Amino acid sequence: MVSERIMLGNKRGKLLNQYVPNYVLYDLETTGISCNYDEMIEISALKVRDGVIVDEFDELVNPMRPIPYAASAVNHITDEMVAGAPVFSVVLEEFLDFIRDDVLVGHNINRFDMKFLYRDCERYFAQTLTNDFVDTLKFARLCLPGRKHYRLGDLAEVYGIPTEGAHRALNDCKMNQQVFEWLAKEKTSVPTTNEKEILCPECGLPLKKRSGRYGEFWGCSGFPRCRYTRNV
C-alpha cells in the first residue's frame, strides 16, 4: 500500500509559472505519446535545494509489452534493457516517496508527463497527484518571449549546455535543470506576475480581460500565438 507520507489526494496540483528554488525536476520515457494506451519505460528525477542538485532517482521500467521500434529509435531503450526491471506500480511508489510534496518541474510536462503520472496514480492508488508543478516550456515562453522554438535542446544551446545523451531521462533532467536555473536569471528582467492573475492553461501566460462583440471575456496575453479564451 502507498505510504501515507506520499502526497496523493482528490485534487490535482496547480500549474505554476515561476521559479522555485526547491523542487524535483523529472522526465519520463515511454512506449509512445498516448497516455490512453502507452506505458512508461524510464523515470528519472533530480532533487534540488536552493538551485543545487542533492539527490537523484533513475529507474528503468518493464512495461510488460514490447517497446515499439519508433520509441527505441528515440530513447535507445530496448526490450532487453527492461526485461529485468520492476513493473511501474513498484517504481511509481518509490518515485512518489522520492518527490514527497515538492514542486515538480519538467519540460512540456503539462501536456505530457503529468498526464501519465495522474493516470497511473489513479490506476494504482485510486487517488491523484497533488503536487504543484512548473512547466519549463511555458516558463521559457514567459522569460524569453518571441523565440521561434522552445524545445529543450534549443534552450540548452542558447545557454551553451551540452545536449549529449538527449532523450534518456536522467540526461534530459540534468539538461533541463540547468536550463531552468538560467531561465530564473532571465526572469529577473521580466515583470513579476501578480499573484491574483489567472494563467492560461494552454501556454502559462497571464489571461487579460478583453471586450468583444458579445461582451467581456478572458483572452491569453500571448495572442496571436495562443488563442485561448474563456468566459468572464
Predicted regions and their residues:
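Short metal-binding segments enriched for Cys and/or His
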Residues: 224-232
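Short alpha-helix plus adjacent loop in nuclease-associated cores
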Residues: 133-150
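Acidic, divalent-metal-coordinating active-site segment for phosphoryl/phosphodiester hydrolysis
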Residues: 168-181
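Residues immediately within or flanking Cys/His clusters that coordinate Zn2+
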Residues: 153, 197, 217, 223
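Mixed-charge, glycine-rich, non-catalytic linkers/tails in nucleic-acid processing enzymes
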Residues: 182-198
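Short linker/helix segments within small regulatory modules
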Residues: 211-219
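Conserved non-catalytic scaffold segment of RNase H-like nuclease domains
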Residues: 2-118, 122-123, 127, 145-167
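Short cysteine-rich clusters marking metal-coordination/redox-active sites
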Residues: 200-203, 220
